Design a protein with these regions (language model features):
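Glycoside hydrolase catalytic-domain context in secreted enzymes
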Residues: 1-210
Length: 210
């Protein structure tokens, strides 16, 4: 069978945290389980934008049920290698197919008032050393292929969130790259939404926060 995660596994039940989406620890809905669907690669293989749009609507609706204001997806990176552990989060190796599917998905999810945030900007392609690996490519490769999924998500679907990648663009961390985030993302594409680094995995973060 396919395992489905309960809401309680992810929900913040610490009401003192100041989190507007915190849930009461005794809330009976914590036992609610999410439905499990096929991944983005399978959706893309249908070449069906209507299906991708329905998929987005389901995820948007789930976000309301689970008290989420932001849905961190869809994945708009390309498959550059069959060995990338995140390929299930990305549609395909083709920039045009990826763009069409992402736009349809985001448009569907937005109908529920949820911020849909495509990821990982930009060039994520490996889980090994992903928090510091340097990615190099020509500007033509970046603009014609790697960036097009995210660009379409913003320009054509009006995505209001973006998650940046852990890797480096050249030798600069993606979340600190002025050319990528200021000049291209906000300057050329006109993005005015929420920009977030990938999920915090440092165990010292809680200590630093205190």
């Amino acid at each position: 069978g396919i395992y489905s995660y309960p809401l309680g596994q992810y929900a913040n039940t610490d009401k003192s945290s100041g989190d507007p989406c915190a849930v009461d620890a005794n809330d009976p809905n914590l036992a609610y389980k999410f439905g499990t669907m096929v991944n983005e690669t399978v959706i893309a293989q249908t070449f069906n934008k209507d299906l991708a749009n329905e998929y987005g609507k389901i995820c948007g609706n789930y976000s309301l049920w689970s008290n989420l204001t932001i849905f961190w997806g869809c994945g708009t990176n390309l498959h550059r290698s069959p060995y990338n552990a995140r390929n299930h989060e990305y549609y395909s190796e083709d920039a045009v197919l990826t763009s069409g599917q992402a736009v349809a998905f985001i448009s569907g999810g937005k109908e529920y008032g949820v911020i849909i945030a495509p990821k990982h900007l930009a060039f994520n392609d490996t889980e090994i050393n992903r928090t510091g690996v340097s990615v190099f490519m020509t500007e033509q490769q970046a603009r014609e292929n790697e960036l097009r999924g995210t660009q379409a998500s913003i320009e054509d679907a009006g995505a209001l969130g973006v998650m940046t990648a852990f890797n480096r663009v050249g030798i600069t961390a993606a979340n600190a790259h002025t050319g990528l985030l200021k000049n291209i993302l906000r300057g050329e594409w006109g993005f005015k939404g929420l920009e977030s680094q990938d999920f915090i995995m440092n165990p010292n973060y809680a200590v630093l926060k205190e």
